[in-house]
C-alpha cells in the first residue's frame, strides 16, 4: 500500500456504530481501502497484475500490505498519482453516486453542507461542472476558502445562527438541491434552505442521520433522498462509480482536495482530527511516512 483512505465512518465504526451494515469483531484492522502496487498474485490470477498501480476497496486498509481478490482492485489510470487515487476510493464513489441521484441542472442553486470534507469538495466540483451555482456551507474560514477555490459562488458559515436565512437570501428563495454532509440537527435544519419542490440528499453521519420533518417536506413538495439508510452501494455499482471517479481525475475534471496526511503510526491522530472537525479537505495515511 502507498496510501490508505481515511473517512469519518472509520471513526464511527471504531466506536461500535453501524454493526448492522459494517459488522466488526475486535480486534480488527480498520480502513476501507487505498492505493498501492500489486506485489504478487495467487493461483489462477493474471500475472500481468504484478507491478501495476491499483486502488483497492477492502476492509483492512490501514496496513502496509493487504490481501484482496481480483474483484476488489482496479488499475490506476496512467498519469494519476496513487495518493490521488486513494483519495477517491470512497469519497469518489459517494460523490458520484449522490451527484447522479441529485442530478443538479444548469443554473440551479445547489447547497453543499460540510463542503470542505472529502466528499463535499468533490460534490462542489461536480455541481459546478454541471453548470449549477453552488453555495458551500462549512464551519471555518479555511474551509470556506477551500470551497470557494473549488468553484463555490457563495460561502456561508453554518455555525452562525442566521446561516439558513443567508442561503435563502443568496439564492433568491432557497436552493433547488441540498447535499447534506453533516447529518444530525444541522442536516435537518438545512432542509429549511431549500425552495419548495427541492431535493434533499443526505449522506452525513457525523452527528447521526438527519431526521427532517417528513410531513413538512411533503407539504412543500420536497423530495427526501436518504440512500445510506439502505446501506452501502453494491460492489458492482461501487466499482462503476470508482472507475468514473478515477477517469475524471486523470482527465483533470475532478481534483481531490487532500488536506492532511499522516504516517500509519499516527492513524489515531487522523481520527482525532476528523472527530474534532479540524481537518480541511481529505485525510490519508501514507505508508512511506508523512
Language-model region placement:
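N-terminal glycine-rich beta->alpha transition that marks the start or flank
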Residues: 1-35
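NAD(P)H dinucleotide-binding glycine-rich loop of Rossmann-like/cofactor-binding domains
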Residues: 23, 33, 53-116
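A glycine-/small-residue-rich N-terminal strand-loop-strand element
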Residues: 35-58
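Mid-domain Rossmann-like dinucleotide-binding core that forms the NAD(H)/NADP(H) cofactor-binding site
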Residues: 49, 88-160
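NAD(P)H cofactor-binding loop motif with strongest signal on the N-terminal glycine-rich segment
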Residues: 114-115, 182, 205
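Short amphipathic alpha-helix with an adjacent loop that forms part of the alpha/beta core around
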Residues: 163-172
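Glycine-rich phosphate-binding loop and adjacent beta-alpha segment
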Residues: 185-253, 286-290
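C-terminal capping/lid region of NAD(P)-dependent oxidoreductase domains
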Residues: 253-257, 269-290
Amino acid at each position: 500500500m502507498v496510501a490508505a483512505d481515511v473517512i469519518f465512518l472509520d471513526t464511527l465504526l471504531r466506536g461500535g456504530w453501524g454493526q448492522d451494515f459494517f459488522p466488526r469483531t475486535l480486534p480488527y484492522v480498520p480502513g476501507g481501502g487505498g492505493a498501492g502496487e500489486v506485489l504478487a498474485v495467487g493461483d489462477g490470477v493474471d500475472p500481468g497484475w504484478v507491478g501495476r498501480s491499483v486502488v483497492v476497496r477492502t476492509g483492512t486498509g490501514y496496513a502496509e500490505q493487504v490481501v484482496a481478490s481480483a474483484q476488489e482492485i482496479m488499475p490506476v489510470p496512467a498519469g494519476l498519482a496513487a495518493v490521488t487515487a486513494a483519495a477517491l476510493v470512497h469519497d469518489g464513489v459517494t460523490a458520484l453516486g449522490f451527484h447522479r441521484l441529485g442530478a443538479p441542472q444548469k443554473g440551479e442553486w445547489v447547497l453543499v453542507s460540510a463542503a470542505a470534507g472529502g466528499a463535499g469538495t468533490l460534490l462542489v466540483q461536480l455541481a459546478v461542472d454541471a453548470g449549477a451555482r453552488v453555495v458551500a456551507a462549512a464551519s471555518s474560514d479555511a474551509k470556506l476558502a477551500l470551497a470557494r477555490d473549488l468553484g463555490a459562488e457563495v460561502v456561508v458559515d453554518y455555525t452562525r445562527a442566521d446561516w439558513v436565512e443567508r442561503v435563502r437570501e443568496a439564492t433568491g428563495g432557497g436552493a433547488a438541491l441540498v447535499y447534506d454532509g453533516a447529518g444530525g440537527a444541522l442536516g435537518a435544519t438545512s432542509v429549511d434552505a431549500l425552495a419548495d419542490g427541492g431535493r434533499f440528499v443526505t449522506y452525513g453521519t457525523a452527528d447521526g442521520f438527519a431526521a427532517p420533518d417528513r410531513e413538512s417536506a411533503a407539504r412543500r413538495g420536497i423530495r427526501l433522498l436518504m440512500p445510506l439508510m439502505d446501506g452501502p452501494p453494491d460492489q458492482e455499482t461501487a466499482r462503476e462509480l470508482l472507475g468514473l471517479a478515477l477517469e475524471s481525475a486523470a482527465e483533470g475534471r475532478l481534483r481531490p482536495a487532500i488536506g492532511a496526511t499522516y504516517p500509519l503510526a499516527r492513524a489515531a491522530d487522523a481520527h482525532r482530527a476528523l472527530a474534532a472537525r479540524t481537518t480541511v479537505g481529505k485525510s490519508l495515511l501514507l505508508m512511506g511516512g508523512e
